[in-house]
UniProtKB/Swiss-Prot annotation:
It holds the Pfam family Mntp. It is found in: Cell membrane. GO terms for cellular component: plasma membrane. The gene is mntP. InterPro entries: Mntp/YtaF, Put_MntP. The chain crosses the membrane at residues 6-26, 37-57, 71-91, 101-121, 131-151, 162-182. The keyword Transport applies. This is Putative manganese efflux pump MntP. Belongs to the MntP (TC 9.B.29) family. It comes from the Bacteria. One of its GO terms (molecular function) is manganese ion transmembrane transporter activity. Keywords: Cell membrane, Ion transport, Manganese, Membrane, Transmembrane, Transmembrane helix, Transport.
Amino acid sequence: MTFEQLIPLIIMAFALGMDAFSVSLGMGMMALKIRQILYIGVTIGIFHIIMPFIGMVLGRFLSEQYGDIAHFAGAILLIGLGFYIVYSSILENEETRTAPIGISLFVFAFGVSIDSFSVGLSLGIYGAQTVITILLFGFISMLLAWTGLFIGRHAKGMLGTYGEIVGGIILVGFGLYLLFPI
């Protein structure tokens, strides 16, 4: 693979990773420990490897009609997660709130990586080099998720008790933006 072929993939990886960054800003406003932040970033990175890989494999066999469905599902997942965070911030006390672990972490990672599935479909149709592509997507998304989580964690300290509500609203807003781009 030449440098000229690598540049578009890096740009595409940053574009896909910006979803993870933006959403991680909101998620970072939860009371997360450093270890949880690292685990969340790695999980997002892994999903940004798995989803485009599946998309690339299926892209060799399927048409691009599933791109809109993946985009819609990702937006709905983000909106639902955002509403859940706002709900839990308002109705539950600090001690009962939990960080995204288990199923909720997988839903979160799936939601921010589902766009990479549709990109993988397209790249699979065009025969992109699978290993380099998915490793770039995963690594850059992981770094951007960590950046968003750390910035969100710092912003929570400045926003006080309203930090999680703001984070949930960011998730809802980002999901709505995916549904209705400006």
